[in-house]
């Protein structure tokens, strides 16, 4: 699992990287990190994601995001698993 650096957080905030919440839409709607977009792991549709940008993925505890990281990497995306929601909220300064 990767821990975001301050520069990586800035890249997300300024739109140079994606923060992708791979939980279900209901889970996402119950609370998510700022700047996150929701692409549920169950229907991983990446058509609107620019392959030239880094993708940081998270879920509830890191399990689904680990699987998504692997899948995206196999498809040529630059993806990193950053763990669970509370890890992300802490790193983003939202905890």
For each predicted feature, which ranges?
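Short, surface-exposed ligand- or partner-binding patches at beta-edge/loop junctions that are enriched
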Residues: 58-59
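Rhodanese-like catalytic fold shared by cysteine-dependent sulfurtransferases
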Residues: 2-8, 12-18, 25-54, 63-95
